[in-house]
Amino acid sequence: MDSVDGLQCLTMTAENPPSGDLIPAPLVTCKLCLCEQSLDKMTMLQECQCIFCTPCLKQYMVLSIREGCGSPITCPDMVCLNHGTLQETEIACLVPLDEFQLYQRLKFEREVHMDPLRTWCPVADCQTVCHISAGDPGQPVLVECPSCHLKFCSCCKDAWHEESSCRDSQSAMPEHGALFGTDADAPIKQCPVCRIYIERNEGCAQMMCKNCKHTFCWYCLQNLDNDIFLRHYDKGPCRNKLGHSRASVMWNRTQVVGILVGLGVIALVTSPLLLLASPCIICCVCKSCRGKKKKHDPSTT
């Protein structure tokens, strides 16, 4: 077995045949690339004992780290009976150091997001994990950042509002720095649904949260889940702020209309066929039901 910084990599090795023996090394089929590889090019997972070729497993891990938002990396075999999960030692052995550090950071951020007793300080330059005192679930709790001493609400992350609800409170505290999401052009904002932090580096203003799949406008945080034609950017304060040319927007709408028309044509064509075939289908179902009833009826045996 190989080792990197004291961590064991479960790379398999084939037993050396006796000298003068020309028996070829056994080959194993990788379930990812479906290619046959020798045992020295395969890696076995600790938890489920599934075997994959090392290059495929490395690529799978890198993609899972970049797209998984810190969630556990599961066995790439879709029919794995043990539902194995990769251990941190395995990940550290097979991916570059920067990718492993990214995985640890995303995993920690996910743990903080899922923990009801921990949250991030909303000050952009702080990035401190704050502890929330236990209270009634869903009720606002005063949280004080141990680093910048900002007092904010545990629910809406706005400045603490003891005598008003989260919806009514829109106060800002510029003396503590720019809060996440208070500026339309802020590089980091919170998803309006799951409140996870999202950073926008480039691209259009139509955003989709990787955590809850909610689609919204980056500038005003309005819901865009049902706006398939992107009409939100035709009027109002976000007009022409989508980030694409007018021609590309029209082409997108044309494609959406084409898909809807195609589905409508398919429905019109298939509906008469279904109506004609429905008596035959009903007869077949009734016949099979009668057969099952006779088979299980004790009076006929």
Curated annotation (Swiss-Prot):
Subcellular location: Mitochondrion membrane; Cytoplasm
Membrane topology (UniProt): Single-pass membrane protein
Chain residues that bind Zn(2+) 3: C153, C156, H161, C166
EC class name: transferase
Keyword Transferase found: yes
Phenotype caused by lack of the gene: Rnf144b deletion mice have a significantly higher overall survival rate than wild-type mice upon EMCV infection.
Residues reported to bind Zn(2+) 4: C191, C194, C209, C212
Catalytic activity: [E2 ubiquitin-conjugating enzyme]-S-ubiquitinyl-L-cysteine + [acceptor protein]-L-lysine = [E2 ubiquitin-conjugating enzyme]-L-cysteine + [acceptor protein]-N(6)-ubiquitinyl-L-lysine
Transmembrane intervals: 256-276
Record note on modification: Auto-ubiquitinated.
Superkingdom field: Eukaryota
Major subcellular site: mitochondrion
Cited PROSITE patterns: TRIAD, ZF_RING_1
Molecular function GO terms recorded: ubiquitin-protein transferase activity; zinc ion binding
PANTHER family per record: RBR FAMILY RING FINGER AND IBR DOMAIN-CONTAINING
Function text: E3 ubiquitin-protein ligase which accepts ubiquitin from E2 ubiquitin-conjugating enzymes UBE2L3 and UBE2L6 in the form of a thioester and then directly transfers the ubiquitin to targeted substrates such as LCMT2, thereby promoting their degradation. Induces apoptosis via a p53/TP53-dependent but caspase-independent mechanism. Plays a crucial role in maintaining the genomic stability by controlling the degradation of multiple proteins involved in mitotic progression and DNA damage. Regulates epithelial homeostasis by mediating degradation of CDKN1A and isoform 2 of TP63.
Domain notes: Members of the RBR family are atypical E3 ligases. They interact with the E2 conjugating enzyme UBE2L3 and function like HECT-type E3 enzymes: they bind E2s via the first RING domain, but require an obligate trans-thiolation step during the ubiquitin transfer, requiring a conserved cysteine residue in the second RING domain.
Family: Belongs to the RBR family. RNF144 subfamily.
Protein name: E3 ubiquitin-protein ligase RNF144B
Organism the protein comes from: Mus musculus
Species classification: Eukaryota, Metazoa, Chordata, Craniata, Vertebrata
